[in-house]
Amino acid sequence: MGYSIVNILGGLLIVTSTMVVVSKNIKHAIRWYVVQSLVLVGLLATLGATTGAQELLMWAGSAFITKVVLVPYILNRAYKKMGEPSDASLKAGLKPAWAICIIAVEVAICFAVVTQISLPTAEVATPALAISFAHFFVGLTCIISQRNIMKQIFGYCLMENGSHVTLALLAPTAPEIIEIGIATDAIFAVIIMSIVVRRIWDDSHSLDARDLSELRG
């Protein structure tokens, strides 16, 4: 029963990731990222209760602080500091329908790969493990397909969430220090990327990647 819930929550992760990718503006993307992070916290807590790994319960707590609270706060603050720019609703390079199809293919490929892996977790949590692997490609799709450079930050966040779930599934008893390292790395990366985006906005008053091809270091 426990792993069934984990797999269901894994399914919700890919749904929320898709919504982040196809969101039309930054505010909606932030809200969907918060929802995904809450699902991630629930997945970690459920997996911890199922496996008896107390470490995962601690992971769930730290994930709530970093992913549900801190990262959205940093992104929202950066967005407001720029005055909520009008081009925050730039259309993506891919239409939503195409993005959904690409994500579906990525999940299917990862599912096919995971079914060939002979690990205990792969046998009981195949969907969740496949989805965690797929998040790397979903994040990459987000980065490549978005014209809005702030929206591209979410691609990194999705990739990081996927690696988080993969580690939890494959090494549920890993020391808490590993989780702290992952979370700290993610927070500082988001802070740095947000600062860079704000500097670009201050200099060019545009978040459109197509307007930034002439930038020089």
Model-identified regions with their sequence ranges:
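Alpha-helical transmembrane segments of multi-pass membrane proteins predominantly involved
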Residues: 1-217
